[in-house]
Amino acid sequence: MSRYRGPRFKKIRRLGALPGLTSKRPRAGSDLRNQSRSGKKSQYRIRLEEKQKLRFHYGLTERQLLKYVRIAGKAKGSTGQVLLQLLEMRLDNTLFRLGMALTIPQARQLVNHGHILVNGRIVDIPSYRCKPRDIITVKDEQNSRTLVQNLLDSSAPEELPKHLTLHTFQYEGLVNQIIDRKCVGLKINELLVVEYYSRQT
């Protein structure tokens, strides 16, 4: 299944706020109206919608998300929390959380087009897994820095999650540590996502 490229407002009206997909927010009460029209949700639909929320927020294909679920299932600790850590530590999401892009698809374009360096080397793979002490910088070329500066100027000022530090004037971000669960930038019940996939096998 390919990455979603359709109307974004349609998705947030059904699933709620997806800051990684779009900065738009659903109108107050739209979730309640949708639920009243469709009646009581089944447990399957609740799990499916949480899975879809995760997939659309991080801009993943179904196959990519399933791969992350399997990796998380083999790791030590809570599968749901490990899954969120894996997704949050992706390079495209890290750029988004630093404020260097307004959405994750926008961050992915910056990476794909070679504007971003990690530890002094160009990394053009959006799924690159950032690690503590990684230094993320914008390529030292005018078009790259102008592009990112415009995005930084356009992004609403938000408190950075504790695992990241941004040095705006150097166009540099630092990964301090693996992200804590409470700093994840999406309202999600990750256990329902794990349950969804466990019932598919």
From Swiss-Prot:
Which Cys residues form disulphide pairs?
Answer: none
UniProt entry tagged with the keyword Plastid: yes
Location of the S4 RNA-binding domain = 89-152
Q: Do you know which PROSITE patterns this protein is assigned to?
A: RIBOSOMAL_S4, S4
UniProt xrefs under InterPro entries: Ribosomal_uS4, Ribosomal_uS4_bac-type, Ribosomal_uS4_CS, Ribosomal_uS4_N, S4_RNA-bd, S4_RNA-bd_sf
**GO BP annotations, alphabetical order:** ribosomal small subunit biogenesis; translation
Top-rank lineage group of the source organism: Eukaryota
Record GO terms (molecular function):
rRNA binding; structural constituent of ribosome
Disordered: annotated segments? 20-44
A single Gene Ontology CC term: small ribosomal subunit
Record function comment: One of the primary rRNA binding proteins, it binds directly to 16S rRNA where it nucleates assembly of the body of the 30S subunit.
**HAMAP family xref list:** Ribosomal_uS4_B
The text of the family note is: Belongs to the universal ribosomal protein uS4 family.
- What protein name applies here? Small ribosomal subunit protein uS4c
The record lists the lineage as: Eukaryota, Viridiplantae, Streptophyta, Embryophyta, Tracheophyta
